[in-house]
Amino acid sequence: METKKPKSIYTTGDVEPTYLDIQAEVGVTKHMGGYAATDALYHLCHLDEAQQVLEVGCGIGVGPAYIAKRFDCRVTAVDISEKMLAWARQRARHEGVVERITFREADVCELPFEDDRFDAIIVESVLAFIEAKEAAIRELIRVTKPGGYIGLNESYWIQPPPPELLSYSTSIGPGIITEAEWRTIWGVTPLEERTIQAHNLEAKQEVRDRIKWVGWRSILPAWGRVLKLLLTNPHSRDAIKEQLNIPTELVNYMGYALFLGRKPQKSAEK
């Protein structure tokens, strides 16, 4: 039977590449809050007690490699971009953990796993790029074991930016919503032990945290690839220039939050 290919958000051919296309091409991943936020999410999801961990939207694979090295568990890493997965596999080989990570191309709204599979699921900077947040969360719950944890790290609007800035937001997350909207979505899930830790962004600290998480070994070559695209690829050149020209004041309207929930245990059969 033919396997249904996940819907891709990545463009091809002569169409101007998107923010995510550029990230995949040069091999870079951005998560709000950097190392500190991601490490806090791992703690909240009790990865030290997990045997099977899923990371959705693994990007270049920093998270899966770190989890595989730090925790005694098996990691499954999925991304909708095969280019991102290629970077992630390369990092796993460099870190010596490729045997402990399974990589799959998949869409967060159509995960190719059976019900009740994972002890913990980590999702960072994924739902900001999709409209179907409720459907994605239902799918995450489906593949989580009863008693397992789901942790999200997603950006939100502290307040919606003015129209002259809002147009730039499509480059950094076309599905960004307000904190109040996020609280409504998370509040009606069937998850237990729901918490939301909201944080404001500080631009300089954000840069430092991202460098600490990704590492100079990945960042410097990535900037070299950005320069190459600027010099050789007209379609990429326009997209990169647009992203580099995003007004810095847009950050003043943004925050990020760590969302935690636990799937209820199944009731004992009577």
Labelled PLM ranges:
Residues 175-190:
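Short alpha-helix
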Residues 155-174:
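Short, glycine-/aromatic-enriched active-site segment of Class I SAM-dependent methyltransferases
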